[in-house]
Amino acid sequence: MLQENNNCVIDTEMRDIMGKSVYIAEKPSVAQEFAKALHVNFTRKDGYLEGGDHIVTWCVGHLVTMSYPDAYDPNLKRWSFDTLPFIPKEFKYEVIPAVAKQFNIVKDILTRDDVEYIYVCTDSGREGEYIYRLVRQEAGVKGKKERRVWIDSQTEEEILKGINTAKDISEYDNLSDSAYLRAKEDYLMGINFSRAVSYTHLRAHETKANL
């Protein structure tokens, strides 16, 4: 079934077969543009919009982050050269406390039984991919048909084109892998160098104080 909106055509056949479709954006303002482009009578709810077979929700930038060393071992909260370099065998992640409410809203939506399709509408790039993949990981999304919307602008025509041509999320696994790798590199460099430099300055200050 083709739906025409202001000279733009959107294929709604897939979404009409069974369950609902979720469109998850990187920020509220972008989510609003997607909602406008869909021309659906949405009802505003806490952290999302819903109308008919469509749900539009959003992140607020990053909702999930990499855990600090003390999440691996409480003893690592105390800085010491003896614990450097810190290189975990497996990396841990956690929901950012300040945005936990929105994460839980998004998690509940993505894992709803009546949701069949998830259209990933985070920014088209490595960081946008990473933002969604972390949410997907921590929310435990399984059994959904995930499609990646890749657009160059937020015009209605571009949004509808992006939805119609959305590819399976697996097409972007390499991009996701590179995002995870870059984040791990930044994390290891940041944690180890900041601790080493800070601890060095602390020891130097203590030495001067004792002279």
Predicted regions and their residues:
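Toprim catalytic domain recognition across nucleic-acid enzymes
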Residues: 2-203, 211
